[in-house]
A protein has these predicted regions:
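Short, solvent-exposed loop/turn segments at secondary-structure junctions
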Residues: 1-3, 78-82, 134-136, 220-222, ...
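Solvent-exposed beta-strand/loop surfaces of large extracellular or lumenal domains
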Residues: 254-276
């Protein structure tokens, strides 16, 4: 649905929900790629801007009742827009002007996996457009309707989808839990030419052009912390996680991590001290951490 769906949703006797462009696909695409969802325009100033991402999400999510939001179709790609994998190459144009091969050039699978992590942990109904799970590329309609890549699938990406879908289905907090943007401090590593706004020590809102998205999904039993580092540098993060109900002294379990080389389900523990989590994030990575009260 294009435009504000409020008039169709607020009475409860017309639409149940919508294809969630305004409150999911578009803000996430701007944040991770700086691209418009058709690949028709680039806005570099929006890439990595947590402020713009959060403001957009809060504004457009307000058009939904909770029940409508939780079943909204949260897509990364579909039949009307360029494939999200293609958007990661940040090429502006269409197949008619750039050629179909350009849709596959310079793509960033790690950024695509970051998007899938958000898709599977954000309020709504994750909806996968055929072929996305196999790494299919394509500019906007009709190039986005390519044949499924039989025999040429990205097997690692398929396995990743299978595992993160399982995680989504196994944990109610990721489906119906509350959502909270988390606050903290971070510091980039491995870059001798940091801009002033890249060193965020003392900034308690993680706002600005920082390419770092941190939020929680939680209910009374489980608390999940999701961190996405969409930057080409590693970074050390100190995150206030007590706000989402995690005890001030606790141990969080890593559920999954995605990075430039792939993904891993290898468990790892992180200590929380005085309500603060300290964690090092690899470049172009996404991490899901969990605290389960029933086991503590």
């Amino acid at each position: 649905h294009y435009g504000d769906p409020k008039e169709w949703l607020q009475k409860g006797d017309q639409w149940d929900t919508v294809m969630n462009y305004d409150a999911f696909m578009e803000p996430l695409t701007w944040f991770l790629t700086g691209m418009e969802k058709h690949s028709d325009e680039a806005k570099p100033q929006l890439k990595g801007s947590v402020k713009d991402f959060e403001d957009s999400m809060r504004h457009y999510m307000a058009s939904f009742q909770t029940s409508q939001l939780l079943c909204a179709m949260n897509e990364l790609s579909n039949h009307d827009h360029s494939r999200f994998m293609t958007r990661t190459n940040e090429k502006v144009g269409r197949a008619a002007t750039l050629g179909t091969a350009a849709a596959e050039e310079g793509i960033k699978p790690a950024v695509f996996r970051e998007a899938v992590v958000v898709q599977m942990t954000w309020p709504g109904a994750p909806t996968i457009y055929y072929g996305d799970e196999a790494g299919l590329c394509g500019f906007t309609d009709p190039d986005n309707r390519r044949t499924y890549p039989w025999g040429k699938e990205d097997i690692v990406l398929i396995d990743f989808h299978r595992d993160i879908i399982r995680i989504h289905k196994e944990h109610e907090a990721l489906r119906t839990g509350s959502l909270m943007f988390l606050k903290g401090d971070d510091n980039l590593r491995g870059d001798d030419n940091l801009r002033g706004d890249d060193n965020l020590r003392g900034d308690n809102n993680l706002r600005g052009d920082d390419n770092l998205l941190c939020y929680a999904r939680f209910n009374r039993r489980e608390q999940f912390v999701v961190l996405v580092n969409n930057k080409e540098q590693e970074r050390d993060v100190e995150l206030e996680v007590w706000q989402c109900g995690i005890p001030k002294k606790a141990v969080l379990e890593r559920v999954i991590i995605s990075n430039e080389t792939g993904y891993s389900l290898m468990p790892k523990q992180y200590e929380v001290a005085d309500g603060v989590l300290k964690i090092s994030l690899q470049k172009y990575s996404a991490v899901i951490l969990m605290y389960d009260r029933s086991e503590n």
